[in-house]
Amino acid sequence: VLAAPIAKYQKGKQMFSKVTDLPCYDLSGEFQKLLDNDVIRWHEVEKDQICLNTVPGQDDNFFYGRGSLDYDWDNSTVDSNGTIKVSLRDVPLKEQDFTVLCSQFRNTVFEDVYNALTSKYKLGRVRIMNLQPKKCLTWHADNTNRVHYPIKTQKGCFMVINSKVQHLDQNTWWFTNTNNNMHTAFNGSKQDRYHLVAAILD
């Protein structure tokens, strides 16, 4: 059962809504400290996602839930026409299996964030997502709605759902109606943009 605020946002069919019943945190300093101390790191090639939670038995693997649950992007190839070929995973991952906080985030403010989220919502993956300067995501739909918390953002960073365009303010919780709604995000600035993104399950 969805928490009341999320159910309200879904019913209203709004693409973006601020969530006001979760505590706000200044995560940028803690996140940078974890990076600087090599506790966590970005993926060597994509530099796109770090997972806060994982599945049982993968407690130290903050890349386990990175990317698509269905498609194996890490083993994609490019054919002679320049078309990217991506295979399905042998065993697809499932959002509901991500129930364990990665060990690297224990005893940090990110554990407080995770506990606050799990006290209100049934979660799938919770990830820190980096959108690099002058980059745009593919136009796609998710099979869950998401709650976003911008850790670092600036002018020129926007999310688009259907035809609605929104800049998501830093250190503010946002519900995004991405379940079966086409959407993308783009970073027109000259700096990285980091969001904490939680999949909300019903």
What are these regions (language model features)?
Residues 185-188:
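Asparagine-centered strand-capping/turn motif at beta-strand->loop junctions
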Residues 127-142:
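Conserved short histidine dyad/triad with adjacent acidic residue
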Residues 2-113:
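Non-heme Fe(II)/2-oxoglutarate
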Residues 150-169:
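A short beta-strand-loop-beta hairpin characteristic of the jelly-roll/cupin
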Residues 167-182:
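Conserved metal-binding segment of the jelly-roll/cupin
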Residues 134, 144, 154-156, 180, ...:
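A generic structural motif
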Residues 147-150, 190-202:
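A short hydrophobic beta-strand segment most commonly corresponding to one strand
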